[in-house]
Each structure stands twice: as C-alpha cells, then as structure tokens.
C-alpha cells in the first residue's frame, strides 16, 4: 500500500511541477541510462532536487541537511524520493560512505556543489565533495544548469 501511495504521490507531484513550472529539459540524452554517475546541478530554489528527480526517467538519490528531516512532511517526501540526511557542516565520512554506497549500487546520485541555495551568487565557492566522491568511485559527473525564477507559471529550464 505504501509503495502504491508513493507512486501516486510522485505522479501527482510531477504533474503539478509540469503545470506550475513548465520545465523544459535540454540534454536528457546525456543522462546515463544504466550506469552510476553524480548529477551536479546549481542550487537556485528549494524545489530544485524534486524537480530534477521528477523530470528524470531514472531515479536519482540525493543528500540533504539533516535539519530538514525535523519537518514531518519533508521526512515523508524524503523517504519517497530517496533523500538521505547528512550533517551540513560536518566533515565526517558519513556522507561520503552513503554516497559511495549509492554509486556502488549503480544508481544516480545528486550533489549540489554549492552546498546552499544561490551559493555562487553569494560568493560561496563550490565544495569539492562531488569531485572527491567521483574520483574515489571512478564515476562521471553530469553537470546540470537550472535557469528560471521558480515563480508559478514561468518556464524553468533544466539543462
């Protein structure tokens, strides 16, 4: 029952994303169809991760700061979408181990190199975790650029 409910919620959510943000996906052919890779988008809005996950045919797992999991609704969605909690400013091996396990299982992993929304616009240099994990796992990095305001009924481009 939970699996059915999860699929139903994902379908409804994807429909809402298409209706409200009219995403245009460019370069979908660059996404690996059956091998592991790290997907690295810029981070412009709180809905970035779910937009990318919803618009991709293959499931993408991601990491999020553990404070977000205090919100019961977010935790529910995180369980549906395969979002794992990590300590945001902790240099522990926990997030690296989780990431390597995801890649070892031949799955896609999404990491936001900025570490925060609009990080580069704020002058924050991208973090090197994605490169470290890619080099350790021997997996490619797929860059993704998100353009748009995420204002309702405006187009968002995922490139």
Spans of features found by a protein language model:
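Residue-level preference for the first positions of well-ordered beta-strands
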Residues: 36-38, 106-112, 142
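A conditional alpha-helix N-cap/helix-loop micro-motif detector
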Residues: 89-92, 123
């Amino acid at each position: 029952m939970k699996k059915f409910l999860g699929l139903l919620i994902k379908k409804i959510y994807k429909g809402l994303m298409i209706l409200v943000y009219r995403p245009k996906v460019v370069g979908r052919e660059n996404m690996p169809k059956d091998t592991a890779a790290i997907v690295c988008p810029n981070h412009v809005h709180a809905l970035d991760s779910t937009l990318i996950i919803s618009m991709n045919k293959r499931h993408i797992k991601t990491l999020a700061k553990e404070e977000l999991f205090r919100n019961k609704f977010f935790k529910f969605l995180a369980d549906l979408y395969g979002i794992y909690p990590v300590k945001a400013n902790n240099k522990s091996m926990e997030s690296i181990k989780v990431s390597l396990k995801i890649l070892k299982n031949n799955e896609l992993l999404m990491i936001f190199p900025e570490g925060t929304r609009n990080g580069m616009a704020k002058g924050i240099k991208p973090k090197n975790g994605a490169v470290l994990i890619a080099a350790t796992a021997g997996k490619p990095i797929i860059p993704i650029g998100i353009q748009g305001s995420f204002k309702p009924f405006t187009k968002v481009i995922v490139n």
